[in-house]
Amino acid sequence: MRMTTGQALVKFLDNQYVSFDGKEEKFVDGIFTIFGHGIVVGLGEALYENPGELKVYQGRNEQGMAHVSTAFAKQNNRRKIIACSSSVGPGAANMVTAAATATVNNIPLLLLPGDSFATRQPDPVLQQIEQSYNLGITTNDAFKPVCKYWDRINRPEQLMSAMINAMRVLTDPAETGAVCIALPQDVQGEAYDFPEYFFKKRVHRITRPLAVQEEFEEALDIIMNKKKPIIICGGGVRYSEAGEALVDFAEEFNIPICETQAGKSAIKSSHPLNLGGIGVTGNLAANMIAKDTDLVIGVGTRFSDFTTSSKSLFKNPEVDFITVNVSKFHGGKMDAHKIIGDAKVCIEELQAMLEANNYESSYEDEIVNAKKAWKEEMKRLTNIKYDENFEALIKPKREGCIEEFSVLTGGLITQTAALGVIRETIDDDAIVVGAAGSLPGDLQRMWETDARDSYHMEYGYSCMGYEIAATLGAKLAEPEREVYSMVGDGSYLMLHSEMVTAMQEQKKINILLFDNCGFGCINNLQMSNGIGSLATEFRYRDENGKLEGGLIPIDFAKVASGYGLKTYSVKTLAQLKEALEDAKKQKVSTLIDIKVLPKTMTDGYDAWWHVGIAGESEIDGVNKAFENKEKNLKAARRY
């Protein structure tokens, strides 16, 4: 079949399907693009001439549209994607950050950036990078470190092997992440006689591999000698749809479950054995039990530093680790005994073996007591008010900063109380989306939901700017559910362009913007380690040339109203509840500008985080922080 490379690519993508548990569905929903000279007359011509069943989406920022695509794939449990195409140069470079975000989170993302001419005839073309030591290097080489597969199509016939391998990676639960196929602009338009079999319908089967028997037997021997195990529920539980199997396993043997950011909402928050979030951003209950556990069973988790508290959380000297993971790489962390396979079938097999050996944990009232303690703390957090008895959760190191914010903005809302009002007001099955700042910590600790896949957190790359774009991606995946972006003012300012795309697609999203006039989370980290506030609050430059002037007030509601969103500016809890109720009635996207007091986010619960503190300083507070770091490091695992 004679056609251009661009036309062949479109036809190929339109014929890709996946099958999971007997359900077959189309894999590629469409293509996001911001057309430029390096893509519009090649791949762009193909999409105009015959897109097949592929939808063409128009992005506003290349990073933003790629975040939309990542969230779309995540919310579809990695079984549907939207590809992303861009022009050469800056358009391609803008997608590098999004590629890293997808790869870190093991989410399939297909990137199709335009590239400079394969023939080099017109070199240097507009937006081309020239390196004197290698003329073959282009901007697209920057994708290599952040992608799971990378290729460049220098001849039309190379498209075939490249796309077969792209699909191999995108549909492999153990290897998936970002894939970059660089498309030189001249090759996009070159015609070639492609074989018809390249365009046949391809069904990529996502299977449930079962680990070898020896791995189960060795795990059985370990578990039978342990009395107080815990389960860590990671993102792999969600993508395998193994939540029910994991709950059955936990109930059978009375084992408590702790959640990672990616694993949250795979099982019900209300379940008696669900302790909630674990680690640096974990809650009191999970971290209390984790401290004394003698066995950690990690299911579908990659054991990030936040989950393990930089490998210091599990303090029992007899603690061992078992992992159930489809990836050998992630399964081997923490010197764990590996069960390599699908979470659901492996948990079911392990359960049958433990049943046959009459295993049961020896917990008595520890789980109930831990949950009771956290319930009391939750009650306290959601009822913190800015009144005569107010005490900030984070002790302010800058005197008067909370009062200054309140006087300037009129804001009287504490962040933890705001989250309590939001949770009780929005729909039970609403999806919340987050990524960066203090909100992921507050949400992992405080957010409770029994609705499956309703907690959408990107905390692998914790990419500021993901939130609003991802809210649109989640809405495209599940248009019948309300979706809420939980975003700070810092992340909003970094990237909010896809609000316009949401308006264009007529997909209602809700943006809950927590404005505390700064990068509050990093300000806390900075000042808790003995450093003064420097460039983490949004302040004017003062007469001494320093960023020490007054806070910069921003009317975010007014900005968003210019885009056509229904907006609200709230300064009290009563106003917040009223705005949330009204927003539910709207047909268009909404933004609620919530003026939240600084230092009213949650702090940690018996968890340490290893950060690179200066080993020598003239500041006493920094030296004390370094000494504390060294003390904690001695108690942590080395790898």
UniProtKB/Swiss-Prot annotation:
It catalyses: 3D-3,5/4-trihydroxycyclohexane-1,2-dione + H2O = 5-deoxy-D-glucuronate + H(+). Binds 1 Mg(2+) ion per subunit. Mg(2+) binds at D489, N516. It is an enzyme of class 3 (hydrolase). CDD domains: TPP_IolD, TPP_PYR_POX_like. One of its GO terms (cellular component) is acetolactate synthase complex. Thiamine diphosphate binds at E62. Residues 438-518 are annotated as: Thiamine pyrophosphate binding. One of its GO terms (molecular function) is 3D-(3,5/4)-trihydroxycyclohexane-1,2-dione hydrolase activity. One of its GO terms (biological process) is inositol catabolic process. It comes from the Bacteria. It holds the Pfam family TPP_enzyme_C. Pathway: Polyol metabolism; myo-inositol degradation into acetyl-CoA; acetyl-CoA from myo-inositol: step 3/7. InterPro entries: DHS-like_NAD/FAD-binding_dom, Myo_inos_IolD, THcHDO_hydrolase_firmi, THDP-binding, Thiamin_PyroP_enz_cen_dom, Thiamin_PyroP_enz_TPP-bd_dom, TPP-bd_CS, TPP_enz. Its cofactor is Mg(2+); thiamine diphosphate. Its EC number is 3.7.1.22. Keywords: Hydrolase, Magnesium, Metal-binding, NAD, Thiamine pyrophosphate. Involved in the cleavage of the C1-C2 bond of 3D-(3,5/4)-trihydroxycyclohexane-1,2-dione (THcHDO) to yield 5-deoxy-glucuronate (5DG). Belongs to the TPP enzyme family. This is 3D-(3,5/4)-trihydroxycyclohexane-1,2-dione hydrolase. The gene is iolD.
